[in-house]
Amino acid sequence: MPVNQAAPLLEHTLIDLLNDMRSRAQVAASSAERISLTRDIALCSLAFYSMHRSYDLSFTLGCQILKLPNCRGLIFNFQFDKTLRASSEAVVVLAARDCPAVCAFRAVTAYILAAKRMGWDLTTGHLFPVVAAGGHRSNLPLPAARMTTALQAHLRVAGLPSHFTMQSFRVGGSLSKSLVGTAVDEIIQICGWKTESVAKCYIGATSSGKVLGSKRTRGQSYASASELPLSPEFQKYLLACARKD
């Protein structure tokens, strides 16, 4: 069944958007505006590089995040309700990157630190809450529909095309990975797609399992070039944390 695919938002557009949002956050007139922008910077970065649905991000909890040793990155243990996906959970590693403009790890950690200065404790409750009046933290998660409304407003302010939706990050992120040679198996695992046929609708994967420009094929081991290996001890710690209620 064909996917009603959103327009892909690619990395160069993301960089322009995030740079504009960071500039606005620095001169924000209120604490509520500043933390809202900082939250949305983290949200957009995470949506692109994790390639997860806005609904998943809306209900992501602070307790589902682990920080890798020596500031090497973050581990997200996304957990889902009953869905048509391959699994009810997905572990995604966001490794620190050299370029601050496109480093989702830095964007998320900057948001967590900014929230802490506001008196928010993001280790409990939703990671991306609604910002209430006065910059207070609401107990409600930021709804997926509101994420798209905010995204399009940010795009208009930045002078960028505003037809994108939150799904555009998922499409653009997966397409960007395919264009640099990432194997289809890896993209399927990160995105949580159930079958390769779904991946084809997004990234044009071939029936042999290759993606545009890919040097790897199906059957080869999953190893992301952007992810750092975990020690056996830390893997055990991660699994123990991921299984907690």
Task: Report the location of each language-model feature.
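Extended, non-catalytic subsegments within catalytic or DNA/protein-binding/adaptor domains
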Residues: 1-245
